[in-house]
């Protein structure tokens, strides 16, 4: 293992502008931001075992982890700083804060993100498909939605009652499947986005009431209705394209 592991770090560059304007006798705020983040020295775990000739990949092949070539003392896993990511995001936000005079507030935020990573890991540190990160190239970041829209609103219904709602919409997130259709020794990591254009959607509603006890003490009761329309957000896809002459029908 690497006995001189580094602390992972990120460099972030941001540029934004915020404005206030009047619309419908109300004060609104708009935000536009561009953010670029590069992360370095993430912790990775890769296989240290090699074939009898010292190679990681099979002769003439571009794929094939040497799992069956354990030395007499067992399997070797190497811990290093090879994980890197980079992402560029655009944030558009429109906000009308709640005020006692208007009795309502609203917020709308849209985020576009272009993310890349140099491993096939999904929140973990494993890098077992290749001998090092240089073989992966830049793959779409897993778990990051390219498009995300969040809308929220609150309204004072009177008599101490407050009603609110929140809507979240996300595009389908990338997954990195294994494609061995070209041969068992020439598999590739083949990114794809499952399902339709919307990968996640949820609408939540809430109602609350505040009670004044006539002293310095107040208490509030709140009821939440989560995922109002019982939308199904699927997960756990089959990330296997198939092998030579045997494509995955799914």
Across the structure, where does each feature detected by a protein language model lie?
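Short, contiguous acidic/charged loop-to-helix segments that flank catalytic cores in large enzymes
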Residues: 5, 82, 137-141, 191-198
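Hydrophobic, lipid-facing positions within transmembrane beta-strands of outer-membrane proteins
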Residues: 11-15, 88-92, 147-153, 201-207, ...
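Extracytoplasmic low-complexity repetitive segments enriched in small/polar residues
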Residues: 11, 28, 35, 236-237, ...
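Outer-membrane beta-barrel signature, preferentially recognizing the C-terminal barrel domain
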Residues: 1-23, 75-89
């Amino acid at each position: 293992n690497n006995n001189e592991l580094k602390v992972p770090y990120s460099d972030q560059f941001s540029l934004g502008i915020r404005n206030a304007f009047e619309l419908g006798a109300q004060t609104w705020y708009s935000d536009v931001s561009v953010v670029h983040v590069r992360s370095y020295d993430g912790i990775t775990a890769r296989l240290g075992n090699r074939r009898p000739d010292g190679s990681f990949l099979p002769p003439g092949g571009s794929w094939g982890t040497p799992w069956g070539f354990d030395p007499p003392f067992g399997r070797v896993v190497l811990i290093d700083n090879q994980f890197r990511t980079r992402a560029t995001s655009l944030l558009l936000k429109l906000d009308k804060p709640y005020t006692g005079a208007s009795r309502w507030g609203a917020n709308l935020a849209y985020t576009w993100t272009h993310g890349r990573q140099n491993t096939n890991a999904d929140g973990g540190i494993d890098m077992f498909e290749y001998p090092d990160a240089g073989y992966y190239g830049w793959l779409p970041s897993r778990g990051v939605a390219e498009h995300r829209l969040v809308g929220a609103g609150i309204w004072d219904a009177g008599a101490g009652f407050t009603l609110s709602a929140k809507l979240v919409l996300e595009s389908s997130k990338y997954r990195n499947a294994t494609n061995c259709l070209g041969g068992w020794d020439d598999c590739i990591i083949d990114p794809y986005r499952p399902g339709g254009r919307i990968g996640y959607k949820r609408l939540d509603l809430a109602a609350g009431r505040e009670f004044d006890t006539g002293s310095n003490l107040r208490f509030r009761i709140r009821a939440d209705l989560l995922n109002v329309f019982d939308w199904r957000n699927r997960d756990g896809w089959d990330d296997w394209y198939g092998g030579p002459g045997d494509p995955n029908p799914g």
